[in-house]
Amino acid sequence: MGEMQVPADRYWAAQTQRSYQNFKIGIEKMPTEIVHAFGILKKGAAIANFNLGKLDEERKNVICQAADDVISGKLMDHFPLAVWQTGSGTQSNMNSNEVIANRGNEIAGKKILHPNDHINMSQSSNDTFPTALHIAAAMSIEDNLFPAMDKLTETLKAS
């Protein structure tokens, strides 16, 4: 597909850069909650792949560390894509794979992770994007709806 120039200070790679350059639609970026959910998903997949004997322990540990950086929000600047993209979320899945692979390689001090071979192992964009949406929805319910319902209940009881 040709060479792509990616800013040196970014963890994303060619697939994300192509999407960023070719699909500048609107100003809305992928919601933080979805990005964090992708981190949770990729961490869980690494643990599952390790438990299945498909991924060695060093790679699993490095993927988990890099995914934790995504989950914590430290790497939000490395997720530049618009929310408006294909229905399967392929661009966001690849953005997550590339960021976690490149951050993981930095953590490891050597190139041991590949976005497709290790971060996306046993996964498909058709599955990861809806799964990330479900994770984000569940977290929002837990973090926002339940506390609001508790507050409403207490307010009504006090009335």
Residue ranges: model-predicted function:
Residues 1-159:
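Conserved, well-structured ligand/cofactor-binding cores
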